[in-house]
């Protein structure tokens, strides 16, 4: 949701940062003598590159042309590793259940579940305990595979078997196909810092 982005935005603005939202960056380059960065030609001391990996790879590849010579190989390597990332889906299945005493459906706001190929959800969140509608549960299946309806039915069976929620009914299923990158053995992950100030 909006909890973390809004808090980050407010903190940045309170500390004097210029935040521009809803603008696609066309170009990113190193300022002369590595004295900062040029975003669409506008100079900045530092840049937080918060984009999908494919977009980050595009922008960092451009940087290699204007960056100090000593950064060129590192920038190209970073762009290649970002471009090579493969994605996996995260599916969230929302079920409406009958809340118990005190409006709670689960004993805690979040529970870990036993997942398997037939029971794909790893976690469940009681949205009612987190400020949402009473009885609304969000089951999260990371690295999910398969059709939306099939996953929904698997999670519904998992809720009934593992949590005893026999009266739970599906409300909505959201599949974010590129939600995360695949954490595979030997993965060459791009580093958090691309170059000084980036």
Walk through the language-model features, giving the residues of each.
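Tryptophan-centered motif/residue detector
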Residues: 1, 11, 37, 96, ...
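Helix-loop-beta segment of a Rossmann-like dinucleotide-binding subdomain
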Residues: 1-15, 142
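A structural signal for well-ordered alpha-helical segments within the folded catalytic domains
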Residues: 2-6, 54, 153
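Generic beta-strand hydrophobic packing signal
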Residues: 8, 28, 47, 111, ...
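A conserved beta-strand/loop element that lines the FAD pocket in flavoprotein oxidoreductases
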Residues: 12-25
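A short coil-to-beta-strand element that immediately follows conserved catalytic motifs
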Residues: 20-21, 164-177
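Mid-domain catalytic core of redox enzymes
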Residues: 23-150, 157-163, 190-191, 195
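FAD-binding beta-loop-beta segment adjacent to the flavin cofactor pocket
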Residues: 176-198
């Amino acid at each position: 949701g909006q909890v973390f982005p809004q808090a980050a935005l407010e903190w940045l603005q309170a500390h004097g940062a210029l935040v521009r939202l809803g603008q696609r960056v066309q170009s990113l380059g190193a300022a002369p003598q590595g004295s900062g960065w040029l975003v669409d030609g506008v100079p900045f001391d530092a840049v937080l590159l918060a984009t999908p990996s494919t977009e980050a790879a595009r922008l960092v590849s451009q940087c290699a042309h204007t960056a100090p010579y000593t950064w060129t190989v590192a920038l190209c390597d970073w762009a290649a590793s970002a471009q090579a990332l493969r994605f996996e889906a995260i599916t969230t299945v929302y079920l409406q259940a009958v809340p118990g005493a005190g409006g709670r459906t689960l004993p805690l706001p979040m529970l870990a579940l036993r997942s398997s190929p037939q029971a794909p959800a790893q976690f469940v969140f009681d949205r009612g305990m987190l400020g949402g509608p009473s009885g609304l549960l969000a089951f999260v299946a990371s690295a999910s595979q398969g059709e939306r309806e099939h996953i929904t039915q698997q999670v519904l069976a998992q809720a009934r078997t593992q949590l005893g929620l026999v009266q739970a009914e599906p409300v909505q299923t959201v599949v974010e196909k590129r939600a995360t990158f695949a954490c595979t053995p030997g993965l060459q992950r791009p580093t958090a810092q691309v170059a000084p100030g980036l």
